[in-house]
């Protein structure tokens, strides 16, 4: 028996309508001394159900874990209605995870006909938002999990050990944000803080287009919840303008090269 541990995450699936795989995995996270990830089957589990969106919790790389390990976890998945901002269509259950049962969840999480209707609010601009809660209530067997992957409390937020220093710096710079976020959005606070920390700790040049997309999604979500994040919006706008200028410069260079090539081809005729 181990200590009671829980985690709550917001998983944003971008470009859902254009996914080229029948399986989508989230980033790996750690709770209860074990690594986990979320698994979505956009077209359902064809083994026994076809017309539902399926969602599961998995133990990745389970074949490398020592024999005898077990985890009992309470799992809750909630589809977010992006139009109303409400958390709805929730499924939850309690499962044992072990060597033979490494994937548990819901084959009929959401009916596809309803899910794929953009006016219903669950699929907006190709984006799907899922709130996942994993509560590990029993631990049998110790697994070799890096301490950097373990969660540590920082100002009331569970963050990775490797991020404690930078997250403390974030709260020192924006204390009002930390105090507002804690009581109002417990479901999203860990994911939002980690996302903000990653964005703010990077320079403009280090931000990928994927980083920008995730940051805009997080900003829109917390803004609907009532937060005024002018400082984040300002940085994202500046970054977006800078990235657009870079693209325009690249296009100019490309046009020049195309013109030179056309001139060369004309000369060779």
UniProtKB/Swiss-Prot annotation:
Disulfide bonds, paired cysteine numbers: none
One Pfam family matching this protein: MATH_2
Domain MATH intervals: 6-134
Key word Coiled coil present: yes
Keywords: Coiled coil
Coiled coil ranges: 228-269
Protein name in the entry: MATH domain and coiled-coil domain-containing protein At2g01790
Native species: Arabidopsis thaliana (Mouse-ear cress)
């Amino acid at each position: 028996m181990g200590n009671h541990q829980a985690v709550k995450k917001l998983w944003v699936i971008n470009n859902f309508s254009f996914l080229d795989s029948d399986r989508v995995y989230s980033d790996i996270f750690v709770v209860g001394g074990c690594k986990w990830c979320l698994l979505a089957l956009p077209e359902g589990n064809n083994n026994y159900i076809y017309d539902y969106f399926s969602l599961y919790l998995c133990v990745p790389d389970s074949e490398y874990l020592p024999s005898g390990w077990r985890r009992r976890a309470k799992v809750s998945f909630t589809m977010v209605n992006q139009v109303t901002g409400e958390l709805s269509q929730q499924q939850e259950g309690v499962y044992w995870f072990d060597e033979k049962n490494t994937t548990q969840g819901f084959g009929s999480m959401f009916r596809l006909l309803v899910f794929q209707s953009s006016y219903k609010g669950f699929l907006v601009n190709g984006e799907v938002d899922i709130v996942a809660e994993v509560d590990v209530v029993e631990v049998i067997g110790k697994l070799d999990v890096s301490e950097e992957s373990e969660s540590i409390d920082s100002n009331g937020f569970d963050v990775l050990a490797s991020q404690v220093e930078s997250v403390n710096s974030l709260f020192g710079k924006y204390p009002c944000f930390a105090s507002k976020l804690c009581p109002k959005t417990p479901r999203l606070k860990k994911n939002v803080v980690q996302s903000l920390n990653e964005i703010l700790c990077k320079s403009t040049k280090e931000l990928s287009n994927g980083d920008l997309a995730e940051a805009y999604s997080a900003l829109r979500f917390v803004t609907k919840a009532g937060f005024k994040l002018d400082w984040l919006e300002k940085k994202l706008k500046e970054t977006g303008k800078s990235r657009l200028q870079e693209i325009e410069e690249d296009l100019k260079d490309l046009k020049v090269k195309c013109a030179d090539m056309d001139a060369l081809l004309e000369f060779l005729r």
